[in-house]
Amino acid sequence: MIFFKKKHDKKLLLGIDLGTTYSLAATVREKSVILLLDKKKRYLLPSVVHYKKNKISVGWKALENITEDPTNTISSVKRLLGRSINFVKKKFPILPYLIEKDIHEGIFFRTNFGNITPIDVSSHILKKLKKRAVLLFNQEIDASVITVPAYFNDFQKKETKKAAVLSGINLIRLLNEPTAAAVAYGLQKLKKGIVLVYDLGGGTFDVSILNLNKGIFEVLATSGDSNLGGDDFDDALAKNIYKKSNLQNRCNDFFQTSLLQIAKSTKLKLTKYEKVEVHFFDWKGYITREEFNLIIIDFIKKTLFICSDLLEEINLSVEQIKEVIMVGGSTRIPLVHTEVSKFFKKDLLKSINPDQVVAIGAAMHVDMLFSSKNNTKNKVILLDVMPLSLGIEVMGGFVEKIIFRNTSLPISKTKEFTTYKDNQTSILIHIVQGERELVKDCISLSRFVLRDIKPQKAGLVRILVTFQVDTDGLIHVKILENYSSKEKKIIIDNNITLKNLNISQILKDSLKHSKDDYYFRVKEEKKIECVRTLEILNKSLKKHLKLISKKELKKIKYTQEKLQKSIQEDDYFSMKNNLQKLDEVSKNFFSLQLKNAIDCSSIKNILKENI
């Protein structure tokens, strides 16, 4: 390993892949990407932290304690970042850690060192990478880009940022992992066309479709599953070994952790060999690659279903995909190669080590961010997208979308709303995220009240709602009430509501219920229109009853009753027809009311002129 004794003139800029199973960092020196190695020339750092009473060890050293002291050795923490206690217990029921609920429904680990959060664990991994960089280059880190899965929600991104702050690393941007991979390949080969990035890591699966053209990387669409990855292969293989071994009477933390480590080791060997001998306590047996393939095939099919749905969503065929980039350690598995290649009907792009490609892309990107503005030769523009639509709740419990899914980032959009009732002095603003029509089927991000609004008639108050989403996907909201200039600004902190987000499932539900949701919304909006019309008409009749004859009033009352009955029966077509009839029979009344208002206004003006 080379150490730089002199302080380097160039800024030290790091691209960091903070992974589920392994983490690594890279930097650009003399137009070449350098992977940061430890003293034993290893570029990978296991994402594992061991906590003793007065000592913390990270990486390979911590990994040695995973079977001996599983309760105090935290691994794959990325899967737990930003998750609630309920989610963790449901999804990972046999974790060996002592997990408890924090005050925000999140989690912390009880360790010999003390109470440790997933943010703390992530920060300790980042500190180790930071130390590696400082030792190697004999200078402090100036800036870094850290990669995250494309489907990390806002809260998970914020927790990643907090981990960077705790580690003392100057983070200037979060970058989607698939986008980083595209940067790594795109800058080398200057690709032009549509590229799909298939990223199967230890804890997450992400797929992104990008349009590459002369240095512009536009993310057309993204999807994935934040709870699908190589760890699931390990769990499934561990269950298979457990069943074969007939050791069901043994079940403690040490036993479970040992079983999982054997499963991981067996999986790695099966990427090279057709048959592997397994020793587990008193049991000895064999696992073949064919058997392993049967265990994991459903997981792989699930990733391909997600790819298929995404292609369908943006009206692309498999034939239109020019290249498929393979990212993530789990793509080393032969069956993954075979099935993905078969699905896309082409050879896969895998010339860059799938473990390294994300860190390489991140290093290239942070280097470009600090390049001279005049040096446009290898400039790249990254256009990421919004993973889910953003909107606010409107009358009837519906969602009015302001920024739609797969909109390029950064983005700022404003939409105007108004009041529903007379003399409102406050308005509840409910911000939601999702693809469904009803608020109850979407994710609640934030609720707050805009107060001290000047009382006015319904529809006269103008409320401007502005959503700004930055390049990291963080959401900034500004609410402005024009008349009284009341304003509120917030940055969304989804500390509870987004913790259990499974975007893949959200999109499936949206497609499944789209027809029913549409018809329900149309019917409910018609009902709201009917109720509002009846309210306005009743108020006008009380005030201007003398303007119409008894015969005309009788017609109006009769049609009102029919419309009221339609509302109670929840019949869309009946509501539509009776509302139309009510408009017809009350047209003359509203004309007389308008004429009367004009006449009264004219009289007032004449009186003013003659006073």
UniProtKB/Swiss-Prot annotation:
Alphabetized InterPro entries for the sequence: ATPase_NBD, Heat_shock_70_CS, HscA_NBD, HSP70_C_sf, HSP70_peptide-bd_sf, Hsp_70_fam, ISC_FeS_clus_asmbl_HscA
Record keywords, A-Z: ATP-binding, Chaperone, Nucleotide-binding, Stress response
Acetylation found in the keyword field: no
Gene Ontology molecular function terms on file: ATP binding; ATP hydrolysis activity; ATP-dependent protein folding chaperone; unfolded protein binding
Gene Ontology biological-process entries: iron-sulfur cluster assembly
HAMAP family cross-referenced by the UniProt entry: HscA
Family: Belongs to the heat shock protein 70 family.
Function: Chaperone involved in the maturation of iron-sulfur cluster-containing proteins. Has a low intrinsic ATPase activity which is markedly stimulated by HscB. Involved in the maturation of IscU.
PANTHER family named among the record's database cross-references: HEAT SHOCK PROTEIN 70KDA (PTHR19375)
NCBIfam families (alphabetical): HscA (TIGR01991), PRK05183.1 (NF003520)
Protein name per the record: Chaperone protein HscA
